[in-house]
Amino acid sequence: MKVPLGLWKVSRGNLWSTQKRVLTMSRCLNSDAGNEAKTVREGPAFSADLYMHPEKWKGLPPQRILELYWERMARLGSEYKPNKDELNALLTTSEYSNVPVNDIKKLYHRGEQGAIDIKGGNVNRDNSLRPFMFDELPSQAQELVAQHREQRFYNRLAAYELPLLAQYRQEYKRPSPESHPVTYRYTSYVGEEHPNSRKVVLSVKTKELGLEEKSLHKFRILARSRYDHTTDIFKMSSDKFEHASQNARYLHDILQRLLAESKDLTEDDFSDVPLDTRHTIAKSLRKKKRDYEFPEHWKRPEDAPKKKFDIVDQLLSTL
């Protein structure tokens, strides 16, 4: 809890600074003691020993009560003892200092310990030196030693255990397009999460699906713009679901439904519907062609820079 003015957080460690402040204030109070018409501050005048009479504090301004409280603590020093009248006067400053009454009681009776309890801190302080752990090196050097130890651990793995994996070698055999015609492409970002990592792209050549001619034509008609007639590749993608495996399963189900619909020629085989290639043509037109040929009549070999004397060729010819 934040205590305004810092009046409740003074401990015995900084009591000397409080005493100096109170003594300075007392000098100001007693500087014009012979002149009864003058006072140290605006308002009614107070007796110099008012701090010794807590029973007279009640009814004074809250700021004045707090000043008298600290003055009494500083002047009495080790002879200071809590007083019931003093506590009752301090409780009247609750609204001014924005500190609850119960917290004022804790601070009054327990001091710094009460302030720590109010804040919810740990009062058990262990200021003793830690036992010697045979770590004669400083912390930075200990980290370097730990890194070196870790590197040696992996070096031992590479030297003694990795060669044992040679007995599990298997020759790589590329899957046959006849048995595995469909390709699923995944995108992974190592060490980070990315929304694009859930996207899966399915691609397959329609001739490798093993369909009859009429079923193959119907499949291409149903595929619409997802079929490229120049490469004979059917492609579709999905990032509808959260995980890539879910999107791959979704694409697999869509492909199976397309195949089942293509093989069903009972209702309509779309034999009278031509293949739509407009999307493929538009895609090829959007591509930038860079296979330009330099015209022959633009070439001017007579304007080419003349070859300078090459000393290396001259030396090689003389040998």
Swiss-Prot record:
One CC-aspect GO term: mitochondrion
Keyword list, A-Z: Mitochondrion, Ribonucleoprotein, Ribosomal protein, Transit peptide
Transit peptide boundaries: 1-30
Family statement: Belongs to the mitochondrion-specific ribosomal protein mS35 family.
Protein name (database record): Small ribosomal subunit protein mS35
Residue ranges the record marks as coiled coil: none
Keyword Ribosomal protein on entry: yes
Presence of the UniProt keyword Mitochondrion in the record: yes
Domain of life: Eukaryota
GO molecular function, one term: structural constituent of ribosome
Assembly behavior: Component of the mitochondrial small ribosomal subunit (mt-SSU). Mature yeast 74S mitochondrial ribosomes consist of a small (37S) and a large (54S) subunit. The 37S small subunit contains a 15S ribosomal RNA (15S mt-rRNA) and 34 different proteins. The 54S large subunit contains a 21S rRNA (21S mt-rRNA) and 46 different proteins.
GO biological process: mitochondrial translation
Main localization category: mitochondrion
Cellular compartment(s): Mitochondrion
PANTHER family with a match to the protein in the record: MITOCHONDRIAL 28S RIBOSOMAL PROTEIN S28, SMALL RIBOSOMAL SUBUNIT PROTEIN MS35
Pfam families reported for this sequence: MRP-S28
Additional detail: Present with 3150 molecules/cell in log phase SD medium.
InterPro entries for the chain: Ribosomal_mS35, Ribosomal_mS35_mit, Ribosomal_mS35_mt
Role: Component of the mitochondrial ribosome (mitoribosome), a dedicated translation machinery responsible for the synthesis of mitochondrial genome-encoded proteins, including at least some of the essential transmembrane subunits of the mitochondrial respiratory chain. The mitoribosomes are attached to the mitochondrial inner membrane and translation products are cotranslationally integrated into the membrane.
